[in-house]
Regions:
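Bacterial N-terminal signal peptides
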Residues: 9-16
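Histidine-centered catalytic micro-motifs
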Residues: 43-48, 155-162
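Bacterial N-terminal signal peptides that target proteins for export
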Residues: 1-9
Length: 206
């Protein structure tokens, strides 16, 4: 019986090792393809301070009353930006929510300025359900727009927007997680991969 458990454990370890190897290979292929442009990367903003809340959610320039990036969130976003640069992944248009945590994530990851828009800003309970639906549709449409030649598009938004736009499979979308889409040319965004922030950093180090 003990030998059976040992054998099962060895098989299980081999399975997980094979999965990890396949995921690494897949990400390597993806980052290589992204050098040519044509992808839309939708990020949930970076890690935030969990003891903060948006106490003035309708005044987007009132940063003092927002949940903002944590020290770790800032550091990881910088590292992801450095990884994109090292990997040769270039962004043309960079769109963010109007909340500071999204704006800063976009700036740190792209290394440049961003266009902040209400279309991908979290509305929550302070806007109407109709407006939340409009924003979800706006995010879906934006993810389906083909980027300029040789460039990728970067979008930084929020969990509710991502969940509303793309469905229940994103219920557990993490802070700093990216969903990489390939627009099909007819306005539809085709999901290619979901990548955690740390995996971009690892890919650049390989």
């Amino acid at each position: 019986m003990k030998r059976s458990y040992q054998l099962f454990g060895a098989v299980l370890l081999s399975f997980f090792a094979a999965c990890a190897s396949a995921q690494t290979a897949d990400l390597k292929a993806l980052t290589s393809a992204m050098k040519q442009g044509g992808y839309v990367v939708v990020f949930r903003h970076g890690a935030t301070n969990r003891d903060q809340a948006d106490t003035d959610p309708l005044t987007h320039d009132n940063v003092a009353k927002q949940r903002v990036l944590s020290t770790s969130g800032i550091d990881v976003a910088k590292q992801v930006g450095a990884a994109f640069k090292k990997l040769g992944i270039q962004f043309g248009n960079v769109y963010t929510s109007k909340f500071n945590r999204a704006v800063e994530t976009g700036k740190l990851m792209s290394g440049g300025e961003v266009s902040s828009t209400l279309d991908i800003t979290e509305g929550g309970l302070v806007v109407t359900p109709i407006e939340n639906d409009r924003r979800a549709e706006a995010l879906r449409k934006l993810a389906g727009v083909v980027p300029a030649a040789g460039k990728n598009t970067l979008i930084v938004t929020h969990k509710p927007n991502i969940l509303d736009a793309f469905g229940k499979d994103w219920f557990e979308v993490k802070e700093g997680e990216a969903s990489v889409f390939k627009p099909d040319g007819s306005g539809k965004a085709v999901l290619v991969a979901r990548v955690q922030a740390v995996d971009w950093i690892k890919a650049a180090g390989n």
